[in-house]
Amino acid sequence: METAIIVLAAGMGKRMDSDLPKVLHEIAGAPLITHVLNTVKNLEPQKVVIVTGHGATEVENKVTQFEPDVTFVKQKIQKGTGHAVNCARSHLKDFKGSTLIVYGDVPFITADTYADILAMKEKNTDMVVLSFNSENPNNYGRLIVDNGELIRIIEAKDANIDELNIKLCNSGVICVDNDLLFDLLNKITNKNANEEYYLTDIVALAYAQNYSIKTVICEEPETLGINTRLELSHAEKVFQEKIRKLAVENGATLIQPETIYFSYDTEIGRDVYIGPNVVFGPGVTVESGAKILPFCHLEGCHISQGSQVGPFARLRPGTELSENVRIGNFVEVKNSIVSQGSKVNHLSYIGDTSIGENSNIGAGTIICNYDGVNKHRTKIGDEVFLGSNTLLVAPVTVGNQSMTATGTIVTKDIPQGDLAIGRTKQENKTGYANKLMKLLKSKKKRKDP
């Protein structure tokens, strides 16, 4: 079945109290609308049209970073969901198939649920509405059903007391033949409490014309929409619990999992150990058998099998750790490759650097990669030993099996097998410590009132 998707993303989100368009607020490092698009693309639709409104340019710029193959149309004046869908007409006028209407601020409806809707649509059904049962329906629209057929949807503001007692609620998601959709939209009016064009009004119109209308029922948590900061916080919690559970089910060990925060795209292998208070930013892959110790922050990095990171380490974008690498406490690595068996165990900054195999980077080593204008690269070879407190002023190359003495400042290449000593010669001034201390104390005494 040919399928088109319309994503409604025009809402101002007034209750978010934010300059940022509502659909661009993030869960686990990705905008709400990106979660929706990641799900619906599993349906392999022939066309995706996103209806924007408030902050249209921002939404378009952000979405195209994730999903370049979508079409945008702007709802210039917000006149309701029916009007928003109608804005997509020009982009779907020649489409023959089913159109699925979803919402950019409802991120938790699963691919399986959407697939169930399409499967129901294929069973000689003209329209399918996604619904859910709720013990506290509040402001949700109610579904009026008779003998298994959906008759109409009544918005809570327009419902009478009997209708408000109905537990079967509208999720907002509708799948309908494309031609029928726009034919029905021509007939809806704004004669309601909000003076808006409701998409839901097409249900009663379709029923009056003897079209077949069915419902698919999902679990209420799937339909969670984000309208306030509090709901956004709750959605983050829901997502984190879901992805933590998935990581454990796939063979990872999470210590105090409630303190571990994943990104939407984090990939965790089997037998990975993750300690408490670890934060994953976007773009992190951890291979099987790796260990992430407590209080680490990781983003845009790849950690290979058997490697260990932390505690208190930070891996920034562009970092690649090969097998059996050790990154220890208070180490920051950015845009660097650390090859198999190498160690950076403590108190170091490694930036724009490649480190060969089985090298040891001493405590306090700093790669001076930035001259105030440009970044420069450093190359450290295999089986290199850098003494503690070594500074490498990039660009510089350290050859295989070479060494630096403690406290060395490296400003030129070190050939293979050489020892570099780049510090001033120590001079001991006999008895000068006592003289200096007396001088300092006398100066302090003169300054004191």
Positions of PLM-derived features:
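Conserved N-terminal catalytic core of the sugar/cofactor nucleotidyltransferase
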Residues: 31-102, 108-113, 439-442
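Short beta-strand segments
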Residues: 8-9, 51, 102-103, 129-133, ...
